[in-house]
Amino acid sequence: MNLPDTLLPCQRPRERLLRLGAPLLNDAELLALCLRTGRHGCNALELAQRLLTRHGGLRGIFALSAQELCTEPGLGVAKACSLLVAPELSRRSIEETLLGRQAMKHPEEVRRYCLTALAHQPVEHCIALYLDQQLQLLACGELERGTLGRASVFPREVVREALRLHAGAIILAHNHPSGNPQPSAADCAFTQQLSQALALVDIRLVDHIIVARDQALSMAERGLI
């Protein structure tokens, strides 16, 4: 990992990972393990710390596009690819855990999935979790990028995909890049519009979760559905 000789073996991220486990490593150490190597005059741990400082933490780094990562000093294509796949692997792992399980019996896992999928996004994204009649997860999918509900065709697309999957219910989720989890008037209006469109084909909108950084707000729990 191009770490300096002054760093004792027991202090190196790889050795600490094997000895202590990932939860006890700090962000810079975990990021250094993803990067594997540093650059000239800068070891992997130092490069990781510089990235965290420059972008305000992991969320800022994972919000970068492929092009932005590739142009970061000291990264290049290989390191950029390692960083691009990390949050996606986490999201897919949680999705596999949820598949076939009753979503409403595992609300914390649903929130964790939504946070993993959306918290790092720099612009609004919307995803849907399609459930069967027993509220078991059938599939997850991305629906929209940009301001929620801007396109009038959007509710029809949700209904069409739900029918294709033979879904009986849906959980919707989108993010607020501003960091404010409170639903806007537009969020509430769109939620009602989608709920009514789904009801026409006997599909229930179970919840609409708003993700804002490390928060996940349930509109159903607020009585807004």
Swiss-Prot record:
- Motif (JAMM motif) on chain: 174-187
Keyword annotations of the record: Hydrolase, Metal-binding, Metalloprotease, Protease, Zinc
Q: Where does Zn(2+) bind?
A: H174, H176, D187
Q: Which GO terms describe its biological process?
A: proteolysis
GO molecular-function terms, A-Z? metal ion binding; metallopeptidase activity
Is Metal-binding there in the keyword field?
Answer: yes
- Asked if the record carries the keyword Manganese, the reply is no
Where would I find the MPN domain in this sequence? 103-225
Q: Which NCBIfam families match?
A: PRK00024.1, radc
What is this protein identified as?
Answer: UPF0758 protein BAV2405
